């Protein structure tokens, strides 16, 4: 385990594996740096960096939370792991962080963003405000209820999957991450940030699962349309959850091509040609 220090002094824990240009993985809700296990094919071509987002695993946290602090955390890991702008693969809210950090000025060599969950009019709306309700459940010691609320009202997992939480040994690990669930809401809640995405100058690949709900498919299409030069790719046979083995060939192809494209990889902020 290694430690980077974010702009506010918070420690951010990260691991590295493999060899080659740096590829940082930014994960979504209920995930830690151990969630994404890099396949050998990816490790042969890239130095893969996984990190605990603030408040998770071995990383610290500092109140009050703002989305900018998540962007600062990614910047700190990037600075600690290389001298060149890194590639970033983001999944779910981790994809939103990568996109919004780039829009805020973080130099990146390329971004592959899988289903950043920016909502739209088609997104199912929970009866209660997610951030407020989860915060109340956590404050009153009802973390198990917070997990169930997220799974049922936000992730919309089937009832049979919810039933698996009862007595599951991994349920405690999910409960430990519930204080960070409102952070995921904060970075995505206002919908596709079209003005922010329009300012991105790094190569971007927007990814989605062909089996995902219609609102997800619409959201990623809107993200691609708002981002200059971005490419949209829908992956057959997958929904919001996609294993590393399935995404690896796509990441290798996109990031290899991005390395040959004039961009912020040279350390400037000029729009690629």
Q: Where are the regions that the model predicts?
A:
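Conserved HGGG/HGGXW glycine-rich cap/lid loop of the alpha/beta-hydrolase fold
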Residues: 3-60
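Helix-rich cap/lid subdomain of alpha/beta-hydrolase
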Residues: 116-169, 184-185
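Active-site loop/oxyanion-hole signature of alpha/beta-hydrolase fold enzymes
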Residues: 40, 49-87
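Hydrophobic, aromatic-rich cap/lid helix
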Residues: 168-193
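Conserved alpha/beta-hydrolase "acid-adjacent" motif
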Residues: 213-219
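Catalytic active-site module of serine/aspartate enzymes centered on a nucleophile-bearing elbow/loop
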Residues: 228-273
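Short beta-strand/loop motif that positions the catalytic acidic residue
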Residues: 200, 206-208
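Conserved hydrolase catalytic core segment
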Residues: 84-122
